[in-house]
């Protein structure tokens, strides 16, 4: 039986109070490899990983490993009020010009065959099954 975690409202709002973390949440419209987040945001991988760990700790992001790649996706908060706030935050981010630019960069990055071929990175939102 899995132990249910206590919802920490302060940590939830602290997670949303950082521009880099908001940018990360904005890019998660399905599962995405950390390599794409690094490429789109133009930040060092350790910084991105630190912010993703904070989002995981706040219950906003879930992760899974596939080979050497970490894949992240949004996780709905257990608290109904927090879930509603997150949904509204994501809708608001969609209207922000800088966030729209991030999404456009993601589309270019993930759809560039040379980048995928060179890095061997999986396409965001698509699960690759190993044989």
What are the roles of these predicted feature ranges?
Residues 39, 50, 56-57:
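Alpha-helical residues within the helix-turn-helix
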Residues 1, 45, 63-66:
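Generic N-terminal leader/processing signal
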Residues 57-66, 73-75:
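Beta-hairpin "wing" of winged helix-turn-helix
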Residues 14, 23-26, 56, 62, ...:
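A cross-family signal for key residues in well-ordered alpha-helices
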Residues 1-5, 32, 36, 77-131:
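C-terminal regulatory/oligomerization modules of transcriptional regulators
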């Amino acid at each position: 039986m899995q132990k249910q975690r206590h919802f920490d409202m302060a940590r939830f709002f602290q997670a949303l109070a950082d521009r880099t973390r908001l940018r990360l949440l904005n890019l998660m419209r399905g599962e995405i490899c950390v390599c794409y987040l690094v490429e789109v945001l133009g930040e060092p991988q350790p910084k991105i990983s630190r912010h993703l760990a904070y989002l995981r700790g706040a219950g906003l992001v879930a992760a899974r490993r596939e080979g050497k790649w970490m894949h992240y996706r949004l996780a709905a908060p257990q608290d109904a009020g927090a879930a509603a706030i997150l949904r509204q935050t994501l809708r608001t981010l969609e209207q922000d010009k800088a966030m729209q630019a991030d999404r456009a960069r993601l589309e270019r990055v993930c759809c560039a065959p040379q980048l995928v071929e060179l890095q061997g990175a999986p396409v965001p939102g698509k699960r690759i099954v190993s044989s």
